[in-house]
């Protein structure tokens, strides 16, 4: 929320839309932000997109995912966590092009995406990338467990949109057993 004169005139062709967002002189943006030690505001997520864990703590899934996508080894990621779960977990889609070169340089043998994605050396590397990002997150928002997708995500199989956005509900259904394994301790 911000306070002051209206920061904008309104939404195009939606009269009265600003008034519904202003309460007692405060404009409610609908954004979740945090303040750094230097006083800077960092956008986390739309409030409507925050997820709540069993503890009642909320975490910003897209913020966590975006930070992890900065890793050259991670092509895509889907965080998992809801009111029925105690912690944040993640499913990782490795970057085959980058990791295949890395594996060849390290003389790690593999023949397929599945073979490479499930190698212990790859798990160690991804765990290090997650630990790097976790240092900057509050404890409840840190990724505690992860698994690598056993295959590259594919728009033709309905796992991604044509613009390569995750189809979360579809992925949660398709990989439900893998997700459950992260929470019952049978994975990672």
Name each model feature, range by range.
Residues 30-32, 37, 71-98:
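C-terminal boundary motif of the adenylate-forming
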Residues 63-70:
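Short amphipathic alpha-helix segments
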Residues 51, 76-78, 102, 123, ...:
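Conserved C-terminal "lid"/linker of ANL adenylate-forming enzymes
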Residues 100-119:
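A solvent-exposed, charged loop/short amphipathic helix patch at secondary-structure junctions
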Residues 1-53:
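Conserved ATP-binding/catalytic segment of the ANL
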Residues 9-16, 97-105:
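Cytochrome P450 core scaffold surrounding the K-helix E-X-X-R motif
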Residues 54-59:
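Short, surface-exposed ligand-recognition loops at beta-strand->loop->(often short) alpha-helix junctions
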């Amino acid at each position: 929320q911000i306070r002051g004169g209206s920061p904008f005139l309104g939404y195009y062709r939606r009269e009265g839309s600003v008034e519904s967002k202003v309460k007692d002189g405060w404009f409610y943006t609908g954004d979740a932000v945090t303040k750094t030690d230097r006083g800077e505001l960092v956008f986390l997520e739309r409030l409507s997109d925050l997820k709540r864990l069993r503890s009642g703590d909320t975490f910003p899934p897209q913020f966590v995912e975006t930070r992890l996508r900065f890793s050259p080894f991670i092509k895509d990621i889907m965080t998992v966590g809801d009111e029925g779960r105690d912690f944040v977990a993640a499913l990782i889609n490795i970057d085959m092009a980058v990791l295949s070169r890395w594996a060849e340089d390290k003389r790690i043998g593999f023949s397929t995406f599945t073979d490479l994605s499930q190698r212990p050396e790859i798990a160690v590397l991804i765990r290090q990338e997650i630990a790097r990002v976790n240092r900057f997150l509050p404890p409840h928002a840190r990724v505690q467990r992860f698994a690598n997708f056993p295959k590259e995500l594919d728009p033709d199989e309905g796992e991604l949109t044509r613009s390569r956005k995750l189809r979360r509900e579809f992925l949660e259904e398709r990989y439900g057993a893998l997700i459950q394994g992260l929470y019952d301790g049978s994975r990672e």
